[in-house]
A protein has these predicted regions:
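Bacterial N-terminal signal peptides that target proteins for export
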Residues: 1-9
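Bacterial N-terminal signal peptides
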Residues: 9-17
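Extended, low-polarity segments enriched in aliphatic/aromatic residues
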Residues: 29, 33-341
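Boundary at the C-terminal end of the N-terminal hydrophobic targeting segment
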Residues: 20, 25-29
Length: 341
């Protein structure tokens, strides 16, 4: 198979940290659509197992007692920016969760199950949990939001439906094709089977690889297709899911890139919400609120690829809101989300 171009590649469970009321500080809420309250997005500067546990607990949606899955990106061979096992292991193990992934749609170390399993082992994930490749044996369609423009159904790894509790654990960074990768990208491309990824990348024209790389739609249609696929997964999970994003090792390139650009931005923190759209919006806002010298490349990447449009389309589909209030878990004011130019 021809490899796609740069455009195509677009034993330690810890107790949860106790949260005191004086450790929670709220930023001024952003304006919400009429009749809809802003979503709460929790924030901590503490990028550590304790910080991750604190963010999870703050959400107030315990998944203990359910059959839990933690959806991450295991990272392409050669990439070292993915969320490391030593960071996420304590949370995964405290929930007795499985890690889940799907095979990719491009030539690399994760397109086929045997090579993917080798990469998973090399990146250390087998040491912290059982890892399930969701589309190893089967795939299935789930309906997209009724007002979707490009996709009627999202084709996902069938093993996703074996679970009753979902932690969508995202590494926020840039992305060659999507502009940025966060919760919505993890929900859409991340949960889709190889054929489902082809469907999203082609905006519904084909489920086949490598055909999808020869049938790329206008960029706006691709971005909207990701939003629609993410909506299908959000609707399927309902109130059984939590969403957490880690803003560290923030390259302009995705963890699916085996030779990513070196991160230029400083690490930011961990964010968590019950609303994946608000979560991604807060992460994007924090990029624009950061030093414009170090965030310039990521801003350019997001804008060139129409990345923020996924937020508009997702909100329009009705499964999330861009309006949020940022709540600090560190006992101080949350970081400013005001744009800095």
């Amino acid at each position: 198979m021809n490899k796609p171009s740069l455009r195509l590649l677009a034993s330690f469970a810890l107790p949860f940290a106790a949260l005191s009321q004086d450790a929670v500080t709220t930023a001024t809420p952003k304006a919400a659509p009429a009749g809809k309250a802003p979503a709460v997005v929790y924030f901590t500067h503490d990028i550590s197992p304790d910080g991750l546990a604190k963010a999870y607990k703050a959400l107030g949606r315990p998944l203990e007692g359910r059959k839990v899955t933690v959806k991450i990106s295991t990272g392409e061979a050669g990439n070292n920016h993915y969320l490391k096992p030593e960071l996420i292991g304590p949370l995964v193990q405290s929930l007795k969760g499985d890690i889940v992934e799907c095979n990719t749609a491009y030539g690399g170390s994760r397109q086929e199950t045997p090579k993917h399993r080798k990469t998973i082992e090399e990146h250390g994930f087998n040491a912290i949990a059982k890892v399930v490749i969701m589309d190893e044996f089967d795939q299935l369609d789930i309906p997209c939001p009724s007002s979707s423009s490009h996709l009627q159904k999202d084709l996902i790894g069938a093993a996703f439906t074996n679970y009753s509790g979902f932690v969508i654990l995202n590494h926020f960074k840039g992305h060659q094709m999507g502009g940025f990768g966060g919760a919505l990208k993890n929900l859409s491309i991340g949960v889709a089977s190889t054929s489902g990824k082809a469907r999203i990348h082609s905006a519904g024209k084909t489920d086949k690889t490598p055909d999808c790389w020869r049938m790329l739609p206008p960029q706006k249609d691709f971005i909207e297709s990701m939003a629609e696929a993410a909506g299908a997964v959000v609707d399927y999970m309902g109130d059984r899911a939590v969403y957490i994003s880690v803003m560290n090792n923030i390259s302009i390139d995705c963890d699916c890139n085996g030779h990513p650009a070196k991160p230029e931005m400083a690490d930011v923190g961990i964010l968590a919400s019950l609303d994946p759209v608000a979560l991604d919006k807060a992460c994007v806002d924090l990029v624009y609120a950061s030093d414009p010298k170090t965030s310039a490349s990521l801003r350019k990447r997001m804008e060139k690829q129409l990345g923020p449009h996924i937020l508009d389309h997702a909100e329009g589909l009705g499964y999330g809101t861009k309006s949020y209030k940022l709540v600090s878990l560190d006992g101080n004011e949350p970081p400013s989300t005001k744009r800095v130019d």
